[in-house]
Amino acid sequence: MDRKEIAEQFYMEEHAVLYALLVKAARELYGDKGELANVEGTIQYGRERGRRMALRALKDGEDLSPKNYLLYSEWVDDRKWSKKDVYAISPAFTTHCTHCGWCESWKKHGLLEYGNLYCSHIDVNLVKGFNPDNVLNIRSVLSQNGPCCDFEF
C-alpha cells in the first residue's frame, strides 16, 4: 500500500482517535510522567514536521516566512472536515477555524479531554520547527471551549 492509499484510509478521525487513546493510556498508566511524555512527544513531532516543511521551502528557493509556512503545510484537509477562514490580514495575519475535524472526532468518541493536549502544543511547535523566528499566537482553540481556533501570525 502506498502513501496515498494509506492517507485515504487513515484520515483525520483515525489520527485524532489514535492520538487521544495514546494520551489516555499514558495518563492512566503513568500519571504525570505519562502526561509529560505526551507533551514532549507532541512538541518533538511538531518541530520535526515544521523542519521538513522548511527544508521543502528552502529547496524551492523560498524564505521561511509565515506565508510560506502556510503554503508548505504537510497536511491538507481534502475532505473539508474543518472550516478555516482568513479573519484578518492586517495588522497581523489571522485565521479562524470554526469547525475542526479533529475536535469533532474527539467529541464523537468521548476523547476530547485527551485530544485537546494536541491543540495545546502542535501548532506552535510546527511554526517553531519551520522557523524559530516566526511567532504564532493562539488566542483560543475549539477543543478547549473557545469560539474558534484563533491563530495570529
Residue ranges, per PLM feature:
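N-terminal accessory segment detector
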Residues: 1-93, 101-118, 129, 134-148
